[in-house]
């Protein structure tokens, strides 16, 4: 019976970003983390974060600190679609503007190194219906309703 209980125990894959686990990423300095990023992200962070991006990080830190333990922090709305997701942002809730509304995004460890805009689609994907009159040569033979 004890063997059956041991088999039921699920093991989850521990998250690593380029071979470094999340706890170590959080302890690293920006310069050390930058070396793990792709060239585009490295170049962007090397040029420095602007005032708006620093204020977003500050607001995310504050929301995380004020959140009760074991609960998600409040959503912080932003227009900064070009913000690179940093390890310290993991666990935060961000409302990313898509040009019409704020899409709520929970930042997970797998998102590190990506841009916020990648998780808030700006267009409505096309749902193709039936072709209309004159759409193609063969559409002349499609009966009208």
Swiss-Prot record:
SUPFAM superfamilies: Ribosomal protein S19 (SSF54570). Keywords: Cytoplasm, Ribonucleoprotein, Ribosomal protein. The keyword Repeat does not apply. It holds the Pfam family Ribosomal_S19. One of its GO terms (biological process) is ribosomal small subunit assembly. GO terms for cellular component: cytosolic small ribosomal subunit. GO terms for molecular function: RNA binding; structural constituent of ribosome. It comes from the Eukaryota. Component of the small ribosomal subunit. This is Small ribosomal subunit protein uS19. It comes from Xenopus laevis. The lineage of its organism: Eukaryota, Metazoa, Chordata, Craniata, Vertebrata.
């Amino acid at each position: 019976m004890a063997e059956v209980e041991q088999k039921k125990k699920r093991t989850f894959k521990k998250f690593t970003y380029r071979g470094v686990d999340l706890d170590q990423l959080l302890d690293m300095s920006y310069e050390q983390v930058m070396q793990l990023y792709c060239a585009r992200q490295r170049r962007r962070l090397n040029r420095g974060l602007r005032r708006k991006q620093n204020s977003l990080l500050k607001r995310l830190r504050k929301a995380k600190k004020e959140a009760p333990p074991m609960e998600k922090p409040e959503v912080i709305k932003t227009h900064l679609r070009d913000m690179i997701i940093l390890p310290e942002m993991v666990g935060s809730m961000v409302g990313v503007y898509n040009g019409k509304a704020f899409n709520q995004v929970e930042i997970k460890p797998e998102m590190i190194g990506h841009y916020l805009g990648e998780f808030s689609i700006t267009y409505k994907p096309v749902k193709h219906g039936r072709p209309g009159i004159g759409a193609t040569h063969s559409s002349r033979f499609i009966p009208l309703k």
